[in-house]
A protein has these predicted regions:
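Long, compositionally biased stretches
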Residues: 1-97
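Acidic, glycine/proline-rich low-complexity segments that act as flexible tails and inter-domain linkers
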Residues: 84-170, 209-210
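A glycine- and small-aliphatic-rich helix-loop capping segment at beta-alpha/alpha-beta transitions
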Residues: 146-149, 174-186, 205-215, 248-252
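General beta-strand structural signal in soluble alpha/beta enzymes
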Residues: 156, 162-163, 189-193, 216, ...
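Glycine/serine-rich anion-binding loops at beta->alpha junctions
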Residues: 160-183, 187-199
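A glycine-rich helix N-cap at a beta->alpha junction
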Residues: 206-230
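Helix-rich terminal scaffold detector
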Residues: 208, 273-284
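Phosphate/diphosphate-binding glycine-rich loops and adjacent basic-rich segments that engage nucleotide
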Residues: 225-272, 276
């Protein structure tokens, strides 16, 4: 089906397309189905929402992040076709049953997460399955490597030091102090941090009060090489991008499953080439 693009100025986390009820009936799709949005410059998979007022018949509304990812122009003609659920949804159900995932299943799951092929509902089921059933050490290692491979890596010509606090305790924001001390000692520490997951504010939220924290990976590398240390938001660059998508689901649930926490930390550290790492696990 060929439809005209319409920009909708809002985001829903996942890539979202909005179709008129009549077009949905003709296409044979319903709310929460997936559709592929295609044109000569790009294609994305989006989760479908339906309306009889927000878009007209013959239009496809794309919410902010989907519109940007699809690289479309206003009223540009797009091909919209139904696409089935990815195989990785069955892997989520497998983990919900408490079964072990293979390396290939984990890699496929992480790839679908990073490509925005899973809905928020499916992502929530994934996070909940890890919170209840966990992962063994082999699965966690495979999850870590799959997350690293899903994005960019940064290479430095010197030894890289890093620090991570798992957080969760209000007021425990030691990272800015540690990074400052390490950088003042002449060592290189390209620190990336997350926003809040299970507490009121993450390190990136705190630091952003007095300094910008959003940089791309090339800017992060230049800053680290120039001044020795950085305090940056990991979600602003393409380092283990699946992790930041998962964090957005963990936050409203207020959970951070142990296997996901470990994979999150280690994937970001490996992505910046850390040689030495200090982990802080606060109690209280």
């Amino acid at each position: 089906m060929i439809l005209k693009a319409k920009y909708i100025d809002m985001d829903a986390g996942e890539y979202t397309a909005v179709l008129h009820y009549d077009d949905c009936e003709e296409l044979g799709v319903r709310e929460q189905d997936r559709v592929k949005i295609k044109h000569e410059r790009a294609e994305i998979t989006a989760i479908l929402q339906t309306t009889d007022t927000a878009v007209k018949k013959g239009e496809v509304g794309l919410l902010g992040n989907a519109y940007t990812a699809a690289k479309v122009e206003p009223e540009e003609e797009l091909e919209v076709i139904y696409t089935p659920k990815p195989e990785s949804v069955s892997y989520i159900r497998k983990k919900m049953r408490g079964e072990e995932l293979t390396s290939e299943e984990i890699r496929s799951l992480v790839n679908d997460i990073s490509q925005h092929n899973l809905s928020q509902v499916e992502m929530s089921a994934y996070v909940t399955s890890l919170y209840i059933n966990g992962m063994n050490l082999r699965e966690t290692a495979d999850l870590t490597m799959a997350m690293v491979e899903s994005g960019e890596t940064i290479e430095f010509d010197t030894a890289i030091f890093d620090f991570h606090s798992v957080g969760g305790c209000p007021g425990n924001k030691v990272t800015p102090v540690v990074v400052s001390i390490v950088a003042a000692a002449g060592l290189t520490i390209p620190k990336t941090s997350s926003r809040a997951i299970s507490s009121a504010a993450g390190t990136a939220d705190i630091v952003e009060v007095f300094s910008p924290v959003a940089f791309d990976s090339s800017r992060l590398k230049k800053l680290a090489e120039t001044v020795g240390g950085t305090l940056a938001w990991g979600g602003s660059m393409n380092l283990a991008p699946a992790d930041d998508i998962i964090i957005r689901v963990e936050y409203p649930l207020g959970v951070d499953p142990h296997a996901q926490l470990l994979a999150s930390v280690m994937s970001k550290k490996k992505a910046v080439g850390a040689n030495f790492l200090v982990m802080d696990i606060p109690m209280g």
